Amino acid sequence: MTSRLQVIQGDITQLSVDAIVNAANASLMGGGGVDGAIHRAAGPALLDACKLIRQQQGECQTGHAVITPAGKLSAKAVIHTVGPVWRGGEYQEAELLEAAYRNCLLLAEANHFRSIAFPAISTGVYGYPRAQAAEVAVRTVSDFITRYALPEQVYFVCYDEETARLYARLLTQQGDDPA
């Protein structure tokens, strides 16, 4: 039986999955890093959907998640979450990052999505140390999938080889085959 958790090194915008997670900022208006890449690849329909969410409920708070159509992406939907800015680890960053992953998974489960792809949330300009963020991600997702049937497949999509090796090592340590 193949693992429900897999590591992929590459471009998250190119994946054909039910949901791609966007490491968004609170405004949901696009930005740098993976957020900008997803907005560019999805086209203007994604920005329009994000504007509508902002009009209806305001900014997306740290640790929360919202869902939009995927625009021109191959995915069915984009789940936007706001991870914490790293401030040394003493401002509930781990709890907020855990909430971001969990809330994305809850949206995926509620929408009956079979597959979801996560970037390394908060590890870019938000400065969360990659190793610590990966531990939170793997622990949170592993815990979730032991209790829920969906999503059936979770991908950790890493932009660079070093981060991909880090996630693969963590999955191997817990007994999952990351390939």
UniProtKB/Swiss-Prot annotation:
What SUPFAM superfamilies does the record tag this protein with? Macro domain-like
Could you confirm whether the keyword S-adenosyl-L-methionine appears in this record?
no
What Enzyme Commission number does this protein have? Answer: 3.1.1.106
Gene3D superfamilies linked: Leucine Aminopeptidase, subunit E, domain 1
Which ranges form a coiled coil?
none
For this protein, the record's SMART domains field holds:
A1pp
**Catalytic reactions on record:** 3''-O-acetyl-ADP-D-ribose + H2O = ADP-D-ribose + acetate + H(+); 2''-O-acetyl-ADP-D-ribose + H2O = ADP-D-ribose + acetate + H(+)
Drop me one GO molecular function for this one: O-acetyl-ADP-ribose deacetylase activity
> Could you provide one GO biological process annotation from this protein's UniProt record?
purine nucleoside metabolic process
Active-site residues, as the UniProt record annotates them: 35 (proton acceptor)
- Keyword Hydrolase found: yes
Macro domain location: 1-175
Domain of life according to the entry: Bacteria
Which segment of the chain is annotated as a signal peptide?
none
InterPro entries in the cross-refs: Macro_dom, Macro_dom-like, O-Ac-ADP-ribose_deAcase
What keywords were assigned to this record?
A: Hydrolase
Binding, substrate: 11-12, 25, 33-35, 122-126
Q: What class of enzyme is it?
A: hydrolase
Q: Which HAMAP family match?
A: YmdB
What does the annotation say about its assembly with partners? Homodimer. Interacts with RNase III.
Q: Which PANTHER family match?
A: GANGLIOSIDE INDUCED DIFFERENTIATION ASSOCIATED PROTEIN 2-RELATED, MACRO DOMAIN-CONTAINING PROTEIN
Function description = Deacetylates O-acetyl-ADP ribose to yield ADP-ribose and free acetate. Down-regulates ribonuclease 3 (RNase III) activity. Acts by interacting directly with the region of the ribonuclease that is required for dimerization/activation.
For this chain, the family text in UniProt reads: Belongs to the MacroD-type family. YmdB subfamily.
This chain belongs to the protein called O-acetyl-ADP-ribose deacetylase
- What is the native source organism of this protein? Salmonella agona (strain SL483)
